[in-house]
Amino acid sequence: MRDESRIALVTGASSGIGAATARALAARGVTVGIIARRSERLAEVLEACRSHAPDSRSWVADLSDPPGAAALAEEAWETFGRLDVLVNNAGIPMRRPVTRISLEEVERVMRVNYLSPVAMTLAVLPRMIERGSGTIVNVSSLGGRLGITTEAAYSASKFALCGFSEAMAADLDGTGVKVRLVLPGAIDTEIWDQPGNDPAFYTGPLTPADEVANGIVDAIDSDHFEHYLPDMKAVVELKTADFDSFLTGMLAMAKRPEAGST
């Protein structure tokens, strides 16, 4: 896509997939609004975006407050006059066994990873429908299709986002508003070394965030609803075909001597 007339709002944009997506959109001439908690990092991303799209803006915000997230989406709409694309990307990990997580921690993960994307979507959706156009991009995870050991809270939040996106895509048929679901796999971002999380069992290669960002940009104008980045759909199909075998493999991975090593 290249269209200087488009405006996109991207959450979780101070690093990783969000920052890369904002830069990729701006490089194509799209004016971007970017949201994240870390002001200094966000300012760096904004500077890069403005070198291509000078009317881009930023908002420093904590998306663990869904009503606040909704108000922010409305503010962004008022600031720009419209939003053509909403990229719900912000997310936090919770990588510990279910025996060592609290309800409060689960609730925070759900607020950031699921409820705030829903709140922001519902805030802009009536106006998109009224205009007869718009695209909602929800960035879930491969963990939104696979229940990954030690990631019960994270997977639950991403499963929820997948279900919401699927139902919404059907609900919005004929309105001119599109829904795109993005499911990244193991991506080279800060999610792997966040405080309060156990080391990851996965120690294989990581896909660069820029590759995922380019995939998200392509997804916006795609005719397809679901986008695995990289393509890991076969793993999901294997689980669906034989869950017992999938679970056996998951347990074997968790019990490897090197599992969880860094």
Put a short name on every predicted segment:
Residues S14-S15:
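Conserved glycine-rich cofactor-binding loop
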Residues R28-V45:
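Conserved glycine-rich Rossmann-like NAD(P)H-binding loop of the short-chain dehydrogenase/reductase
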Residues S39-E40, V60-A71, L103:
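The beta1-alpha1 cofactor-binding region of Rossmann-like NAD(H)/NADP(H)-dependent oxidoreductases
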Residues P97-V98, S102-E107:
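Substrate-binding pocket helix/loop in short-chain dehydrogenase/reductase
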Residues T121, S157:
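Active-site helix of classical SDR
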Residues S141:
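Residue(s) in the substrate-gating loop at a strand-loop-helix junction
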Residues A169-D231:
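SDR active-site lid
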